[in-house]
Amino acid sequence: MVVGQRSSVTDRLLLKAKKMHTLKKYVLALHTQATTLFDDLRAGSVDAVNRGVTRDTYGKGEQFGHELVEKHARTLGLEIRHDHMRNTYMVLPGLDRNAPAIVIGSHLDSVLGGGNFDGAAGVMAGLIAVQAMQRAGHKLNCDVVVMGIRAEESIWFQVSYVGSRGALGTLPASALQQRRIDTGRTLEQHMREADAEPEAVAKGVAYLSPKNVKAFLELHIEQAPSLALTGYALAIGTGVPGHFRFPRVKITGEYGHVGLGRRFRHDAALAGADLSVGLDALWQQWEAEGRLMACTFGEFQTNPARHGMTIVPGEFQFSLDVRAYDDADVAELEQALMTIVGQIEQKRGVKFDFGVRASSKVAKADPIITQQLRDCAQRLSMTVCDLPSPASHDSAAFCAAGIPFGFVFIRNPNGSHHPDEEMSIDDFLQGTAVLTEWLATHG
């Protein structure tokens, strides 16, 4: 090659780099569209009673979210599909319609009185990425599928990843008989009201699989203030914790008179308090050792039908979620829990009934996709860090089904699952630009 003459390979690389930066400009130019999408979503699901928004799983709130994104997708000319769970798929056709697709998305339901961005940001990111590629005239080899997922928030039916596991054929049929906490009606009943097909769940029908999905990409707000405190706008997610859950644990002691001596008591409330203190002490010990875990007592109460100021509590009920980032650690924590429980039962003269157990394995982000996302951010002059997710996400269901996933976090200084959840549109578009470059490079 003549000195000073560029090779055709170099020219192609330079052209590709130029296209990538052009795509970023197209993403950033969609600020108004992104703002409008989030504003419209909030307006249609605002909860005046509980503050924040409520997009109830298989209810009017979640349904509004799906109708909103589907309407927007139609304006972009995307193909619209639904599976037996009534998940929404908005498809940008690729050059090879038979190639495994890239799915990008998240859930559209929320907790009661939650924030507007948890889950929804991942769906909106997919729509903005697709629109940017359309405007840039960028064609991908495979289909890009923006997925609005149903029923991720387990608070409603006490079951994890209902929509995604249903689509993947991994949701157990027993989940159909779980009752929604507010209506008392079963998941099966709610699904039928949404024109879903619960009988397909019972048959284990898989709409998505490693055969037709190349990868799953999820953008999500961080659900802790870590990024805000460290000055990062974005992070690349490295994994989703595994957990075990007991939605309804009951401690049975013995009701007694308020004047009863300590040695005669079988106080169920103090037994619950002992367990909370014991697990918190274990958590402090793990933190001191540099080991990551978390435990949460979401419900924690005596029986309101029988408790009173002058009565020793004979019943106590709580929910428990314990999580960690290694399956061996999760198993160790459950063993430690049962050891503590045995000590409390002997000390207080009470009995624990843990009821139904739910669990999920640790899901590690695909290392190749993770590095590719880091590289995309670097090429776009964005500074990112790695961050393990403190929360559970639909990505874990895809991972368990054998589909690799990648994850991008957006900073959120106020945490999540409450009305003050926060995300700037500028940060959102930066994260979406990273996903868009990944799609353009690897799609």
Protein language model regions, located:
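N-terminal capping segment at the start of a domain
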Residues: 17, 21-59, 176, 416-418
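Zn-dependent metallopeptidase/amidohydrolase metal-coordination segment
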Residues: 33-40, 105-106, 384-437
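A non-catalytic alpha/beta surface segment that caps or lines the substrate-entry region
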Residues: 46-93
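A short beta-alpha structural unit
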Residues: 54-58, 294-305, 324-325, 351-370, ...
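Catalytic-core environment of secreted peptidases
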Residues: 72, 76, 88-121, 126, ...
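Alpha-helical metal-binding/catalytic segments enriched in His/Glu/Asp
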Residues: 104, 113-152, 245-251, 260-283, ...
